Amino acid sequence: EALKSKFITRYIVSTDDEEIQQVAIQCGAEAPFLRPSVFSTDEASSVSAMQHAVAWVERQEGVEYDYIVELMCTNPMKTVEDIDASIEKLISTKADSVIAVHQLEDHHPARIKKIIDDKITDFCIPEIPESRRQDLKPEAYIRSGSIYALKRDYLMVEGKRYGSDNSRPYILPQERAVNIDTEIDFIIAELMLNK
C-alpha cells in the first residue's frame, strides 16, 4: 500500500538484519545500510533509529528532506488512503506531526485498575461502578503505532515523533489498527489479511 502514496518519494527500510534488508529490496524499497547495533537493541528508541536513517540518507546524498513518514511494519492493515490522508493533514495544518490513533472501545482508561494490598482501585480516572462502555467519557484514543508523519526538524532537532502542542491525530478505524506484538496478534492479522 505504501508504494501507492502520491506523496512519498523514497522508501527507506532501516534494519539490522540482512534477510529483512533483501526482502525490503525485493518489495521495492531501498535498504542502503544495515542499522548499527546501538540503534537495534531493546533499549534503543524508534526515534534514534529514525534519526540515524534520516541522517545517513541526507549525508550520503547531500539533501535535506522536508517531511519524514514512519510506517511501522507491525501494523499491516493501514491503507494508502490512511497514509496520504495523514500526510495531507500534516501539510495542510502545518502540524509538527500527525500520528495514527484509534478509539478505545472496551478498554477506556476509566476501566484500568491497579492492585494495592490485594484490593482493586482506580488507576488514574475514577470509574462509575457498572458503567457501560458507551457511557465512558470523554472518548479515549491510543496511538496505533501505524503512521507517524513528521516535519523533518521536529524529528531531527526536537527528537520527537509526537507530543508537541501541534501534534495532530489521524483516526484509524478499529479494523485497521491491528498491532503485531505477539503470536496471537500475528494470527489475527494473517486472518484479516486473508479475508
Residue ranges of predicted features:
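N-terminal glycine-rich phosphate-binding loop and ensuing alpha1 helix
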Residues: 1-14
